[in-house]
Design a protein with these regions (language model features):
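Feature recognizes metal-dependent phosphohydrolase scaffolds
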Residues: 1-241
Length: 241
């Protein structure tokens, strides 16, 4: 769910939702309807789009509302992954419980800041990370759409069959992103599900779990693989970060 929310948010942010709708046939109508109703009178100034100058005013209005709607949902679904995986050490991404919704402020590291956007109708201050019934329904539909999209699955299986996080070719080492290092330049050790890895070992265990997210028969390992796919996208200890 964390990956799905990120994909949609980024597509919305850069005005590329048509990639999902037209390119992959992902039905975004439930999200669009929810966003237009929930943020009907909200200009969503903090969620303006970047890029795509060809957007007309109507599309722009709808997309900024979708951008805000999926951003709030992303905060909520990511908190569930973070809670389930304390070893990821990503608690700092959980921000909703630091907000004073009456004052419209957030407290970070002991300092209070005013929020630029104070309209969060789907957040319950007592349970800020709980999805509303509508948000849960939207995520369930999106999950089914992504999982049942034949074209998307075909593209992902192509990447898994042909690609890897690193490759030795013609005497050269090719690798994605950056190898995590300590300040002294030595390889940084990163804990993945209770075990420490660094360098080549880190690349191999992360790739192994990505593949498990698609192919593992053990439900626990498959779930861990899905969580790792989200982790490698945004953790500072991930080579792909």
């Amino acid at each position: 769910r964390g990956c799905i929310a990120n994909v949609i948010r980024i597509c919305a942010r850069y005005g590329n939702l048509d990639i999902l709708e037209e390119g992959y046939g992902i039905n975004l109508l439930p999200l669009a309807t929810f966003a237009m109703n929930t943020y009907k009178d909200d200009p969503c100034e903090c969620f303006k789009l970047k890029g795509n100058p060809d957007y007309n005013a109507t599309e722009m209005l709808m997309d900024v509302k979708m951008h805000k709607a999926i951003s709030v949902i992303q905060f909520k679904v990511e908190s569930q992954i973070i809670k389930k995986n304390p070893g990821f050490k990503l608690e700092k991404r959980n921000l909703l419980h630091h907000i004073n919704y009456e004052k419209g402020t957030i407290e970070l590291d002991g300092k209070e800041y005013k929020l630029l956007d104070k309209n969060f109708p789907t957040i319950d201050p007592k349970k800020p990370y709980a999805l509303t019934k509508e948000e849960e329904d939207i995520m369930e539909r999106l999950e089914r759409a992504f999982e049942n999209c034949e074209k998307l699955q075909r593209h992902m299986h192509f990447l898994l069959n042909k690609g890897g996080l690193y490759k030795v070719y013609n005497g050269n080492l090719l690798y994605h992103g950056c190898v995590p290092l300590k300040e002294d330049g030595n390889l940084k050790s990163v804990r993945i599900f209770g075990r420490a890895y660094k360098g080549k070992g880190l690349y191999e265990v992360l790739e192994s779990y990505v593949r498990k997210g698609f192919y593992a028969m053990d439900p626990k390992e498959k779930e861990r693989g899905k969580d790792i796919m989200w982790y490698i996208w945004l953790s500072e200890n991930s080579p792909l970060f």
